[in-house]
Amino acid sequence: MKKLVSALLVSSMAISLVGCGAPKAPAAAEATTAAATQAAAEATTAAPAGPEAITLKVWAPQVDQVDENSWINVMLPKFEEAHPEYEITWDIGVCGEGDAASIVKNDPAAAADVFFYANDQMGTLIEAGALSKLGGSYLETVQNNFSQTHVDLLTYTDGGVYGFPTSPNTWFMWYNKETFNEEDIKNIGTMLEKGVVSFPMDNSWYTGTFFFGVGATVFGPQGVDAEAGIDFSSDLCVEATKYMIEMVKSPNFVNDVDGIGVAGMKDGSIQAMFSGDWDQPALAESLGDKLGCAVLPKFTMNGTDYQMKSFASNKAVGVNPNAKFPKAAMQLAQFLTSPEALLSRYELSGYTPAASACAEEEAIKSNPTVATLNAQMANTIAQPVLAEMANFWDPVKNFGLNILNGSITADNAKEMLDATMQLLNSNGL
């Protein structure tokens, strides 16, 4: 049979598919004494009670529930098959990963039991009492099925892991294969000698790549130590600043702003740029087989190569600690982020799967963009989720702007970097 429930606070649709299967002792029996239980068992030969009736409220992105063949509507019946101990009423609502915190925190008790969220919202959700910390077999599953980077991205200041990863998010390099060969793309200096390279020097999500490449940290090695602050103070960071100064002076350098990179790649005036998988459709349409993608290149300072590194973030499935049926909610979150489920989501919704095992699947290996995104995750630092991260974006953006306009020079590089450090840690860190 099917059960329907009322609409959610968010735009929603309600569906229900009831599972059935192996019988389970009723919860009421647990309240009786051992003697009464034994007497009742001896007094009757009636069939044992059926599955436990539960309701699970799930909020997922619109793309995952467009129609009955969409991912979430395919996976929920499979969860029922895997858990015949439950008779489940499904309450399904639409809520994108980027909107989860703003909606859930308003009334955590009324929010979904299981929801999808972007990891930069983790702190807000935890502080609102709306996100469960994983433990036991659930924590072990995350640690075993996902890379350490994905685990770190969902680790909070208390050391707890607060979600099941679904998909990665970072940036890498796009290039024109007619200009650069596989050897060229290993070093950005070599590329600047052969073709026009576009890089968003004044976009702080990208600018830090050279600092990260020489060991700079943002709130410690794992990005969760507020007291450690943002540390761009090393001599190598000064040298990296000088490298950036020389880089923007190259006649083959173009600052990527307002879509210049994509436009230039499409018309042929630019041969390499840096962004993520979101630009793949536009670039592939124009370049076809000429389009290549690769992990970030290295850069050379004083004869030593350093690896450019990007910020990494991810998206996850979280469980609300206010869930009426917390065990079932945890089981569902775990089920939806299994390698098999995430591969299905890739096929039906287009999300790159975060599970390590998925990288070995032919569907993933045969997609250069997805393979590159997964490979780049190994050359990243975790984008911190601390509130203090708000101090990062504007000072680093302005640092990049001052490199572009010539205000920062080789002579004042250390002085300007020190001044930026003060702004980055201006709240007393």
Give, region by region, the residue ranges found by the protein language model.
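A structural signal for short loop-to-beta-strand junctions that line the ligand-binding cleft
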Residues: 101-105, 110-113, 140-175, 196-200, ...
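Mature extracytoplasmic/periplasmic domains
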Residues: 281, 315-390
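Extracytoplasmic/periplasmic substrate-binding proteins
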Residues: 61, 75-76, 115, 247-325
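Conserved C-terminal helix/tail region of periplasmic/extracytoplasmic solute-binding proteins
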Residues: 375-429
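Glycine-centered hinge/linker elements that transmit conformational signals in sensory
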Residues: 226-255
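Hinge/lid segment of periplasmic solute-binding proteins
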Residues: 41-43, 47-48, 119-172, 183, ...
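Conserved N-terminal structural module of periplasmic/extracytoplasmic solute-binding proteins
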Residues: 6-7, 17-123, 300-303, 419-429
